[in-house]
Amino acid sequence: AHVKAGGGRGVGGIISFRPEDLSRTAEENNSICLGCHEKGNRTNWHGSTHDERGLMCSNCHTVMKDVSRKYQLKTAFQPDTCFQCHKNKRAEMWRSSHIPVREGKVVCTDCHNPHGSYSENLLKTATVNEVCWQCHAEKRGPFLWEHPPVTESCLNCHDPHGSNNDFLLKISRPRLCQQCHSGGQHNSNPRNPLVTLYAQGRECQNCHSNHHGSNNPA
């Protein structure tokens, strides 16, 4: 692909390109790639997290080999390229509740732009919620009664890569709810021995099922 793309731009820059030439800095190596690949999702590369940490294009991509179906990645399975550095995220995805990356239903770049972003954590959208709503549109609303932690950030309740609690929750229910809802008219601790007889097997969502937002006051 690179030989064909070279056209009249010179043999030296295309065919004899050695991306990991140790005599050049990461910036100098990357500038060779960015000479052609400077548009699209790469416009925010300069100053991005990966740029600041001295990553080279060749850390993730091959130049002449066809290992992956797209993007000339170093691995056949796109997330494995990310996991070369992000080993903690690979571990999270082996938890009982996890984003279906290892099943092949989602890849890292569905949520992140590794080449740079205006938002935190190289997200493809301005906010975390907008990333989540790409798949979970039914949680977006609008609702007559919004749930403030949800409108603020899905990360208030969820661990997006993996959790040992149902639904990617950060901690188990009802303790998750009790972080904010510690008071109220009714006993907010169904595990209190004094109310076990009446609250056994019950959780907050038995009554408050639409915790992302509701058109009913409760």
Regions found by a protein language model. Give the residues of each.
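Short sequence/structural segments immediately N-terminal
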Residues: 1-218
